[in-house]
Amino acid sequence: GDINGYHTDMRVDMVVTLHACDTATDYALYNAVLWNAKYILSVPCCQHEVNGQISSETLAPMMKYGIIKERMSALATDAVRGELLEYRGYRTNLLEFVDMTHSPKNILIRAVKANISTEKRNKALNEVKNMCDELHIEPTLYKLFTQGDKEI
């Protein structure tokens, strides 16, 4: 199935994703926020989108080597996701959920609906915007939350 465009009229308390490839994680997180889910647990998989966009003169040595660029892209993608969930009112943690020896894809995004001040939410969005500008990236979740026509 495809999470992009999936709709439900049922109440959603928790959204769980495991290795939703590339932007599928973004659509799952976006839908979780639209559904006003109380809890989100997401283990992203590959982050190809940002790897194809990222560039930085300041970080040129990191952009030169494919494996370093790939890992930086993955970390940048998940950091943006975490901050955007904060922006949308979720207390968010990014944690290692299994040891690296078992899986290199071991970051869990854990988000719980919370009462986060408008000031903190706007700060999270501004930090994401600055990071995206610096790295020349426009991740799908950022576009969905800032250019979407739905009020969340």
Language model features: what each stretch is:
Residues G1-I152:
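Class I S-adenosyl-L-methionine
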